[in-house]
Amino acid sequence: DDGHSLRLLTEPAHQVSAHYLIPRDTHERPLPVYQLVPDSQRAWHAGRSRWHQYAGLNASSLGIEIVNLGYPPQDELLPAHQRRWQPYTQAQIAALGALTRKLVERYQIPPTQVLAHSDVAPERKQDPGPHFPWRELALHYGVGAWPDETRLAELRHQPAPAWDALGWQQRLARYGYGVAPSGNWDEQSRAALRAFQLHFRP
Protein backbone atom coordinates (compact mmCIF):
# COMPACT_ATOMS: atom_id res chain seq x y z
CA ASP A 1 0.00 0.00 0.00
CA ASP A 2 0.97 3.66 -0.13
CA GLY A 3 2.15 3.89 3.47
CA HIS A 4 4.34 0.81 3.22
CA SER A 5 5.84 2.06 -0.04
CA LEU A 6 6.66 5.44 1.49
CA ARG A 7 8.36 3.80 4.46
CA LEU A 8 10.29 1.41 2.24
CA LEU A 9 11.60 4.25 0.08
CA THR A 10 12.41 6.73 2.86
CA GLU A 11 13.71 4.73 5.83
CA PRO A 12 17.53 4.33 5.59
CA ALA A 13 17.44 0.76 6.91
CA HIS A 14 15.86 -0.45 3.66
CA GLN A 15 18.68 0.95 1.48
CA VAL A 16 16.35 1.69 -1.42
CA SER A 17 14.92 4.96 -2.68
CA ALA A 18 13.45 6.69 -5.72
CA HIS A 19 13.11 10.25 -6.90
CA TYR A 20 9.34 10.00 -7.28
CA LEU A 21 6.51 7.84 -5.95
CA ILE A 22 3.06 7.65 -7.51
CA PRO A 23 0.54 6.33 -4.95
CA ARG A 24 -2.53 4.18 -5.51
CA ASP A 25 -4.96 4.34 -2.61
CA THR A 26 -5.49 8.07 -2.13
CA HIS A 27 -8.82 9.58 -3.23
CA GLU A 28 -7.20 12.86 -4.24
CA ARG A 29 -7.68 13.84 -7.88
CA PRO A 30 -5.52 14.51 -9.71
CA LEU A 31 -3.35 11.92 -8.03
CA PRO A 32 -0.47 13.49 -6.07
CA VAL A 33 3.13 12.69 -6.97
CA TYR A 34 5.59 12.50 -4.07
CA GLN A 35 9.13 13.70 -4.73
CA LEU A 36 11.35 11.79 -2.29
CA VAL A 37 14.82 12.66 -3.61
CA PRO A 38 15.85 15.85 -5.48
CA ASP A 39 16.54 15.31 -9.17
CA SER A 40 20.13 16.44 -8.63
CA GLN A 41 20.85 13.67 -6.11
CA ARG A 42 21.29 9.94 -6.58
CA ALA A 43 18.46 7.58 -5.62
CA TRP A 44 18.95 3.86 -5.04
CA HIS A 45 16.43 2.29 -7.37
CA ALA A 46 18.23 0.52 -10.24
CA GLY A 47 21.00 -1.36 -8.42
CA ARG A 48 23.27 -3.44 -10.66
CA SER A 49 22.20 -2.21 -14.06
CA ARG A 50 23.42 -1.39 -17.56
CA TRP A 51 22.24 0.41 -20.69
CA HIS A 52 24.57 0.84 -23.65
CA GLN A 53 27.99 1.67 -22.21
CA TYR A 54 26.61 2.94 -18.90
CA ALA A 55 26.66 0.75 -15.79
CA GLY A 56 25.32 1.44 -12.32
CA LEU A 57 22.48 3.64 -13.54
CA ASN A 58 21.60 5.04 -10.13
CA ALA A 59 24.21 7.71 -10.87
CA SER A 60 22.69 8.83 -14.17
CA SER A 61 18.96 8.24 -14.00
CA LEU A 62 15.74 9.41 -12.39
CA GLY A 63 13.79 6.68 -10.63
CA ILE A 64 9.99 6.59 -10.53
CA GLU A 65 8.14 4.01 -8.45
CA ILE A 66 4.42 3.32 -8.77
CA VAL A 67 2.48 1.59 -6.00
CA ASN A 68 1.38 -1.74 -7.44
CA LEU A 69 1.07 -5.22 -5.94
CA GLY A 70 2.61 -6.96 -8.95
CA TYR A 71 1.28 -10.51 -8.89
CA PRO A 72 0.05 -12.78 -6.05
CA PRO A 73 2.67 -14.92 -4.25
CA GLN A 74 1.13 -18.16 -5.52
CA ASP A 75 2.02 -17.12 -9.09
CA GLU A 76 5.75 -16.92 -8.33
CA LEU A 77 6.60 -20.22 -10.05
CA LEU A 78 4.52 -19.51 -13.16
CA PRO A 79 6.04 -18.06 -16.35
CA ALA A 80 5.80 -14.27 -16.34
CA HIS A 81 3.10 -14.18 -19.05
CA GLN A 82 0.84 -16.48 -16.98
CA ARG A 83 1.02 -14.46 -13.77
CA ARG A 84 -1.96 -12.37 -12.73
CA TRP A 85 -0.40 -8.92 -12.71
CA GLN A 86 -2.29 -6.05 -11.10
CA PRO A 87 -3.28 -3.35 -13.62
CA TYR A 88 -2.35 0.28 -13.08
CA THR A 89 -5.22 2.69 -12.45
CA GLN A 90 -6.12 5.40 -14.93
CA ALA A 91 -5.32 7.99 -12.26
CA GLN A 92 -1.82 6.51 -11.89
CA ILE A 93 -1.29 6.52 -15.66
CA ALA A 94 -2.40 10.15 -15.91
CA ALA A 95 -0.06 11.17 -13.08
CA LEU A 96 2.79 9.20 -14.63
CA GLY A 97 2.19 10.71 -18.07
CA ALA A 98 2.21 14.27 -16.74
CA LEU A 99 5.33 13.67 -14.63
CA THR A 100 7.35 11.91 -17.31
CA ARG A 101 6.43 14.46 -19.98
CA LYS A 102 7.69 17.23 -17.70
CA LEU A 103 10.94 15.38 -16.95
CA VAL A 104 11.57 14.43 -20.58
CA GLU A 105 11.11 18.05 -21.67
CA ARG A 106 13.18 19.48 -18.81
CA TYR A 107 16.15 17.15 -19.31
CA GLN A 108 15.79 16.45 -23.05
CA ILE A 109 15.62 12.68 -22.51
CA PRO A 110 15.57 10.70 -25.79
CA PRO A 111 12.70 8.20 -26.25
CA THR A 112 14.99 5.15 -26.06
CA GLN A 113 16.33 6.35 -22.70
CA VAL A 114 12.92 6.06 -20.99
CA LEU A 115 13.34 2.61 -19.53
CA ALA A 116 11.97 -0.03 -17.20
CA HIS A 117 13.93 -1.60 -14.38
CA SER A 118 13.44 -4.82 -16.33
CA ASP A 119 15.24 -3.22 -19.30
CA VAL A 120 18.35 -2.19 -17.37
CA ALA A 121 18.51 -5.21 -15.05
CA PRO A 122 16.66 -7.97 -16.94
CA GLU A 123 18.14 -10.86 -14.98
CA ARG A 124 17.02 -9.37 -11.65
CA LYS A 125 13.97 -7.21 -12.18
CA GLN A 126 10.52 -7.65 -13.74
CA ASP A 127 8.93 -4.31 -12.93
CA PRO A 128 6.95 -2.44 -14.03
CA GLY A 129 5.38 -5.57 -15.56
CA PRO A 130 3.21 -6.31 -18.62
CA HIS A 131 0.44 -3.79 -17.79
CA PHE A 132 2.76 -0.80 -17.88
CA PRO A 133 1.30 1.71 -20.40
CA TRP A 134 4.27 2.12 -22.77
CA ARG A 135 2.02 2.64 -25.80
CA GLU A 136 -0.17 5.20 -24.05
CA LEU A 137 2.85 7.11 -22.75
CA ALA A 138 4.33 7.34 -26.23
CA LEU A 139 1.16 8.12 -28.19
CA HIS A 140 -0.62 10.41 -25.71
CA TYR A 141 2.22 12.01 -23.75
CA GLY A 142 5.14 11.89 -26.20
CA VAL A 143 7.22 9.88 -23.73
CA GLY A 144 9.36 6.86 -24.58
CA ALA A 145 9.82 4.73 -27.67
CA TRP A 146 7.03 2.88 -29.48
CA PRO A 147 7.09 1.36 -32.97
CA ASP A 148 5.24 2.91 -35.89
CA GLU A 149 2.07 0.84 -35.95
CA THR A 150 1.51 1.12 -39.71
CA ARG A 151 5.00 -0.21 -40.37
CA LEU A 152 4.47 -2.88 -37.72
CA ALA A 153 1.31 -4.10 -39.46
CA GLU A 154 3.26 -4.41 -42.72
CA LEU A 155 6.05 -6.37 -41.07
CA ARG A 156 3.59 -8.87 -39.59
CA HIS A 157 2.85 -10.09 -43.12
CA GLN A 158 6.51 -10.80 -43.81
CA PRO A 159 8.46 -13.92 -42.80
CA ALA A 160 10.10 -13.74 -39.38
CA PRO A 161 13.85 -13.00 -39.56
CA ALA A 162 16.00 -16.12 -39.42
CA TRP A 163 18.55 -14.69 -37.00
CA ASP A 164 20.72 -17.02 -34.96
CA ALA A 165 21.68 -16.34 -31.33
CA LEU A 166 24.46 -13.97 -32.37
CA GLY A 167 22.10 -12.00 -34.58
CA TRP A 168 19.63 -11.49 -31.74
CA GLN A 169 22.39 -10.59 -29.31
CA GLN A 170 23.88 -7.99 -31.65
CA ARG A 171 20.52 -6.32 -32.17
CA LEU A 172 19.60 -6.33 -28.49
CA ALA A 173 23.01 -4.86 -27.63
CA ARG A 174 22.66 -2.22 -30.37
CA TYR A 175 19.36 -1.12 -28.88
CA GLY A 176 20.96 -0.81 -25.44
CA TYR A 177 20.56 -4.07 -23.54
CA GLY A 178 23.57 -5.30 -21.59
CA VAL A 179 24.16 -8.37 -23.74
CA ALA A 180 27.60 -9.67 -24.68
CA PRO A 181 27.31 -11.05 -28.27
CA SER A 182 28.80 -14.54 -27.91
CA GLY A 183 26.70 -16.71 -30.20
CA ASN A 184 25.58 -18.75 -27.18
CA TRP A 185 21.92 -18.45 -26.23
CA ASP A 186 22.68 -17.91 -22.54
CA GLU A 187 20.49 -16.74 -19.67
CA GLN A 188 21.67 -13.15 -20.08
CA SER A 189 20.42 -13.15 -23.66
CA ARG A 190 17.13 -14.87 -22.82
CA ALA A 191 16.50 -12.35 -20.03
CA ALA A 192 17.21 -9.41 -22.36
CA LEU A 193 14.84 -10.78 -25.01
CA ARG A 194 12.13 -11.29 -22.36
CA ALA A 195 12.62 -7.69 -21.21
CA PHE A 196 12.37 -6.40 -24.78
CA GLN A 197 9.14 -8.35 -25.31
CA LEU A 198 7.79 -7.15 -21.96
CA HIS A 199 8.40 -3.57 -23.07
CA PHE A 200 7.13 -3.76 -26.65
CA ARG A 201 4.88 -6.84 -26.69
CA PRO A 202 3.43 -7.29 -23.18
Language model segments and positions:
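Secretory-pathway/luminal and periplasmic proteins that interact with or process carbohydrate-rich
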Residues: 2, 122-131, 199-202
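Helical (often loop-to-helix) elements that flank the catalytic cores of nucleotide-handling enzymes
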Residues: 73, 85-86, 124-138
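Active-site-adjacent loop/helix surface patches within enzyme catalytic domains
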Residues: 1-112
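Short acidic, glycine/serine/threonine-rich helix-capping segments at coil-helix boundaries
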Residues: 156-202
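Acidic, His- and aromatic-enriched active-site or binding-groove loops in soluble protein domains
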Residues: 21, 130-158
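Acidic/histidine-rich, metal-coordinating catalytic segments
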Residues: 109-124
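Solvent-exposed, acidic/flexible segments
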Residues: 13, 57-60, 85-93, 130, ...
